[in-house]
Amino acid sequence: MRQIAFYGKGGIGKSTTQQNTMAAMAEMGQRVMIVGCDPKADSTRLILHSKAQTSVIQLAAEKGSVEDLELDEVLVEGQWGIKCVESGGPEPGVGCAGRGVITSITYLEEAGAYENLDFVTYDVLGDVVCGGFAMPIRQGKAQEIYIVTSGEMMAMYAANNIARGILKYAHSGGVRLGGLICNSRKTDREDELIMELARRLNTQMIHFIPRNNVVQHAELRRMTVIEYDPKNSQADEYRQLANKIVNNDMKTIPTPITMDELEELLIDFGIMAQEDESVIGKAAAVA
């Protein structure tokens, strides 16, 4: 069994990419479980055709404790037999959502949820912002990490930060970076830019996913593209990505870059203008 995790900036399309890729894997005959590690509990909605799956933390709060839960209450089978679990988290402004990830994964292990699987995938909230959300990396639960990014500066900044988190635990936990997934935003020279970022981070751009409105059409119906329009070229993109992950033998310890190096990269590709210190902080009328 391989345990992988999808990380990336909030709003980059991480959950959508993960669900479509896992759907493609299941279509290939792989036995898959998705563990959502986001308080929004939206990591399984396209597989289950639901708004949000009831989470481990939510059910534990209703029943009194995690020990009072039955596995079939929190683990639901969706399309292609994909097993789905959402860790969930507390109400906004109360408690630590990262604790929900820790509690849920521990419960799933003890309840035997990891038996008879080929792939377990963790869909993790945004950046590596706290120890709880870094838990799949920190405790070696996820052995390989895939970072969803794009040619936008903040998406690349987040990818570099996540690479730092992987590096921190690479020697103690054995976690490795499997590659960057470019979820295209149609920025200039995007594929070249992410390939160069990958090179500097000592990894690969494992796949470039082109922008296609069919993804949004499928999402509105709470479906993956694989199910909604299986003959669409976009469905084949996710199948290619799934196949590349299954056969990926390039798992590396990343080499994060500095913020200055990232800005230089963007300048080299013409995404960001050479900084002119004389105009910083000046309004248009003054500058």
UniProtKB/Swiss-Prot annotation:
Binding residue positions for [4Fe-4S] cluster: 96, 130
Source organism, top-level taxon: Bacteria
Biological process annotations from GO: nitrogen fixation
Annotated SUPFAM superfamilies: P-loop containing nucleoside triphosphate hydrolases (SSF52540)
Any one Gene Ontology molecular-function term assigned to this protein's record: 4 iron, 4 sulfur cluster binding
EC number: 1.18.6.1
UniProt keyword terms in alphabetical order: 4Fe-4S, ADP-ribosylation, ATP-binding, Iron, Iron-sulfur, Metal-binding, Nitrogen fixation, Nucleotide-binding, Oxidoreductase
PTM annotation, UniProt: The reversible ADP-ribosylation of Arg-99 inactivates the nitrogenase reductase and regulates nitrogenase activity.
CDD domains: NifH
The protein's enzyme class: oxidoreductase
Catalytic activity: N2 + 8 reduced [2Fe-2S]-[ferredoxin] + 16 ATP + 16 H2O = H2 + 8 oxidized [2Fe-2S]-[ferredoxin] + 2 NH4(+) + 16 ADP + 16 phosphate + 6 H(+)
Cofactor details (free text): Binds 1 [4Fe-4S] cluster per dimer.
Binding site for ATP: 8-15
Pfam family, one: Fer4_NifH
Family the UniProt entry places it in: Belongs to the NifH/BchL/ChlL family.
Primary role: The key enzymatic reactions in nitrogen fixation are catalyzed by the nitrogenase complex, which has 2 components: the iron protein and the molybdenum-iron protein.
Oligomer status and interactors: Homodimer.
Protein name (record): Nitrogenase iron protein
Organism: Frankia alni
Upper classification of the organism: Bacteria, Bacillati, Actinomycetota, Actinomycetes, Frankiales
